[in-house]
């Protein structure tokens, strides 16, 4: 029963994320993406450095997103974090990613619940595949991620400036805590 309720809540939340575009009729500025993502290089662990969190991620500590290509071309994703504190209970979510734009590999649909695929865009990726920003056209959620649990203040400030330039409300941005 709890699982069914969670699926229902996730579905309603994702529908709510798109309702502004559906019902208001306004179309946000397009979200730019990187020119090309080498998916094999992108796979692996990414530590969430800062985020405008979804309801599932609120109060998350040690958040790590892991990507692995599956034989069918989809991307098996594992999102792991501790709920409430650094030593809190471990939570694991396993959405599936689907590359929507094969020319760039930078626009994905991320599916937590069938058949809904949430907008997921790689809007920044450094040349060494060590830091990335994932955004959404609706600008409701964003993730600054890195291959390491911490980054320099200079890099952090630069990434936050990029998020700001994309039109996000920085008041909602939360820095993640890692051990």
List PLM regions with ranges.
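Bacterial N-terminal signal peptides
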Residues: 7-14
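A beta-rich soluble binding module of mature secreted/lumenal proteins
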Residues: 17-179
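Positively charged n-region of N-terminal signal peptides that target proteins for export
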Residues: 1-4
């Amino acid at each position: 029963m709890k699982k069914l309720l969670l699926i229902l809540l996730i579905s309603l939340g994702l529908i709510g994320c798109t309702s502004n575009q559906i019902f208001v009729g306004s179309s946000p500025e397009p979200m730019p993406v990187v020119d090309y993502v080498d998916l094999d290089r992108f796979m692996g662990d990414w530590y969430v450095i800062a985020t405008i969190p979804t309801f599932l991620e609120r109060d998350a500590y040690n958040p790590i997103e892991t990507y692995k290509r599956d034989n069918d071309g989809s991307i098996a994703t594992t999102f792991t974090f501790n709920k409430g504190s650094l030593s809190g209970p471990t939570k694991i979510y396993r959405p599936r990613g689907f590359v929507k734009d094969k020319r760039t590999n930078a626009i994905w649909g991320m599916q937590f619940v069938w058949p809904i695929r949430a907008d997921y865009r790689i809007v920044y990726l450094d040349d060494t595949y060590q830091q990335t920003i994932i955004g959404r056209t609706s600008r409701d959620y964003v993730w600054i991620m890195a291959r390491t649990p911490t980054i320099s203040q200079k890099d952090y400030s630069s990434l936050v400036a990029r998020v700001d330039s994309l039109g996000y409300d920085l008041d909602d941005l939360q820095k993640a805590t890692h051990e």
